[in-house]
Every structure is written in C-alpha cells, then in structure tokens.
Amino acid sequence: MAIFQIINESTPQVPKVKQSLNEKKWIQIGLEYKKAKAKGMTGKQFAEERGIKYSTFTSAMSKYASGIKTAEKIQKLESKPMNKLNKQERQLLMINSFRQTLRDKIRNEGAAINNKTRKWFAETIKQVKGHKVVRPQPGRIYAFAYDAKHKETLPYWDKFPLIIYLGLGKHNLMYGLNLHYIPPKARQQFLEELLKQYANTPTITNKTKLKIDWSQVKGFRGADQMIKAYIPGNIMGSLVEIAPKDWANVVLMPLQQFVSKGKRFSANKVWSNI
C-alpha cells in the first residue's frame, strides 16, 4: 500500500500545510466577505469599510479562493452532528484539525549542530507540549534519549527516537515506529493517514490516540524502516509523551541524531531508500 498514492487520490483538498499569518488573515477576511456579500454588500464597499485597497482585496480573494472555499466547507461541517458526516467529511475535519495545530515556525537554533547532547535534547523538546511518563500507552507518541545495546555493530542508530508506541513484545521490549527513519514531510503524511483511519477522536484533542498494531501499518511505505524494538533499561532519562496537539509540530523538528560507529551519520543517507 503506497501511502503517498492514497493521500493524493482520496484526501479532500485542504489549506496548505504551512500557512503564513497573512494567508490566515486573508482567509478569515474572505469568510467575512462571503457573509457580507450574502446581505447585499459589494466587494468594493466591503474593502472600503475595512480600509483595504480594493485592488489588494480583489487580488487576495483570487489568490486565496481555494483556501476560503475549504474554510467555508469546514465551518459547515463543524456545525453538523458527527453521526451525519460521511467518511470523507470526517477525514477532512480530522486533517484540518491536525494541520491547524502547526505553528508558523518552530524555532530550533540547535538543529544544525553536529553532536546533539542529552542537554540539547531536553531543551529542544521543551518547545512542544509534553509530559514525562513511566508507562507509555499504545497509540501515543513519545520522545526519549537512547543508548543502543549493539551500537558497535549496528550500521546506524538514532540517539533521540520519536516513536508511535505499539506496545510491549517478547523479552519486555518496547516496539514502536520511529518517525525519524523517514523524512519530515513523509512523517507528516504518514501520521495524517493514520489519523484518518485509526484515530479514536474525530478531531485532535488531548485524548487522541491511534488504535493500531503492527499488522495494520506494516504495509505502509517506510514502515519496515521505522519499526524498532527498544530495551527499557537503555532509555536515558524519562520518556516524554507528546501532547496530540503538538504532534504536527514535533514530526517536523530535526530531533534525530543518527550515529554509526561512534560518529554522526547523515540523516539523508538514512532516508535515501524511502
């Protein structure tokens, strides 16, 4: 199952993943104009009333027409009872909810450093909402520092995993999908597809989790690279459970630190086969 084909073929059109503040503003203005227009106000009157140059207003309405149309559709869907929505409408609401949590920019001044430390990791992870836990829950996302048991023989490994936790397996091993083993954009697409199919809530809330196991995700592109087993005793420090409303942000952060034979290993090389 090719996840990227699924997204292109079945996902309704939604606003761009990373809107600028200017775009968000214009989309809101566009929604207000549609209401005013329904009451008989012209575009020129609307623009003048708000102190906007008419040519600027018409240009923006044209440029963001698709985003305005989608936002209008979302508003209508949000007013409908959930049991009256079809599958496609529910998926649109979920993906819109997920993408609305994206921040305009995640500051990460340490992203380019070559040797990321546990201190760097601890400081960087504070940029997203999360809390320390002892017992992880399947279907949630966790970040932690890790010291691989077989680091001398592994071709490469990740010091700071970011996993969708699947549960405990044989020998008390923690199984999870380490999102760092695929590129940031692919992480977002992968997570969106899981949310559409397996989320336990219709929109992103603090209670959101993914009702999945390995059998449900093993066919997704990149899953065989992401699936990892972790020894609880080799986790350095605490597990940080990422709040669902920050999933969209944390998957785009360059937290990964791949290591091979004690030296930093290029993430691009890890992703080259995806």
Curated annotation (Swiss-Prot):
Chief location of this protein within or outside the cell: virion
Q: Which GO terms describe its cellular component?
A: virion component
Superkingdom: Viruses
> A GO term (biological process) for this protein?
symbiont-mediated suppression of host innate immune response
Subcellular location, record wording: Virion
Alphabetically sorted, this entry's keywords are: DNA end degradation evasion by virus, Host-virus interaction, Inhibition of host innate immune response by virus, Viral immunoevasion, Virion
**Membrane-spanning segments:** none
The function of this protein is: Binds to the viral DNA ends and protects the viral DNA against recBCD mediated degradation.
Protein name, entry field = Terminal DNA protecting protein
The scientific name of the source species is Enterobacteria phage T4 (Bacteriophage T4)
Q: Lineage, please? A: Viruses, Duplodnaviria, Heunggongvirae, Uroviricota, Caudoviricetes
Which gene is annotated as encoding this protein in its UniProt record? Answer: 2
